Amino acid sequence: MKTVLITGGTRGIGKAVAQEFLQQGYEVILNYFHDEEAALATQSEFNMQGYCPVLMRADVSDEEQVKDMFKEVFRIYGKVDVLVNNAGISKIQVIQDTSVYDWEEVFDVNVKGVFLCSREVAESMIFSGGGCIINVASIWGEVGASCEVAYSASKGAVIAFTKALAKELAPSFVRVNCVSPGVIDTEMNSHLSEVEMEDLINQIPLGRLGTGEDVAKACLFFAENSYVTGEVLSVGGGFSK
């Protein structure tokens, strides 16, 4: 049975990705950090469906915590077949109000976290003859978003990281790809007013918000297709502004 570790896997997009992989018969490890109550509730919800995902608490921006998490995962499962780097944070603010702390906090989770988790899993994947790393970026990393400079820049970095690492690991049959969600109906977009949300929907050719399931199916495609690497798949309903 294949194993997938999903960072930020107990809510939003990560939870939807977990659901998709559980339904496909994967052993699923759900990483979380801040909200243990929500993590346990998600685990319980999956248990009621007959699934048994494992929770792993770790701050993906903390090198030692990431190392400890993967040591425990390797102890239990031996390897990780698929890593989904989904954990991320955003800050809504104009650049004049963005402190160095704000900037570094976003980059620590969104970029450093992807680096640390990918680094820890790479050697195992190489020695086991292959694997798959899927990074969750954002359409804002491709086109930019006003008042989200730090977030947009961090997701642009994730896209560049994906393309570079894909070339580096391809000779070892480790595939690295990126899913780039558009406007998805999750808690991360709850700050948007009804008018702002309507304006965004009007810019989406398919005329609706995306769902976590839409993103999850893209992740599963990358996990299951052995001849795709270095790609960025936009899941945004045609939004490209």
Protein language model features and the residues they cover:
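Residue(s) in the substrate-gating loop at a strand-loop-helix junction
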Residues: 138
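Active-site helix of classical SDR
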Residues: 118, 154, 162
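Alpha-helical segment proximal to the catalytic Tyr-Lys
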Residues: 123, 167-171
